[in-house]
Amino acid sequence: YGVVVTDDQNRISSFQEKPSVDEALSDTINTGIYIFEPEIFEHIPSGQSFDIGSDLFPKLAELGAPFYAIPMDFEWVDIGKVPDYWQAIRSVLMGDVRQVGIPGKEVLPGVYTGLNVAANWDKINVSGPVYVGGMTKIEDGATIIGPTMIGPSCHICEGAVIDNSIIFDYSRIGAGVQLVEKLVFGRYCVG
């Protein structure tokens, strides 16, 4: 993350793009949500590479431009890489991300679904936390062990085991397939 140092009016006095923990001048991060006036283009040279975080923000701070931070009371989760995204979903399912709840209806303790999920929960082995997206079909005899997220419009066949995995939308997991700590991108058939 970029790190900002602000005064008591939240005016940014310095900006560091991705410093090490030891080099960071504060614990206030820049999360990448910006509102600029059109005059910002006066500070950006044309015809060359110019990075907002590495070039523009330090320049604005140096110039003493009216450059402000807005403190927000929420947890920012970086999902720039697949392992980060996977961990973010697990963290939400486990209830570890402030102010973010699992969407849908809780059909069993720790098991949430979107609309129109076709599942006979009495004949499915499931232990949460689990989220199942809308329009998904889960056949009798399937096993789902959390933390697991199954996207919308999926089909989980009889005897399939989904354990600590993420399955994106429109995926089909065949009979007897075992997925343990797997990520299945959307529109795939497994097994």
Spell out what each predicted region is.
Residues 39, 46-191:
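Left-handed beta-helix
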Residues 1-48:
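Conserved core of the sugar-phosphate nucleotidyltransferase
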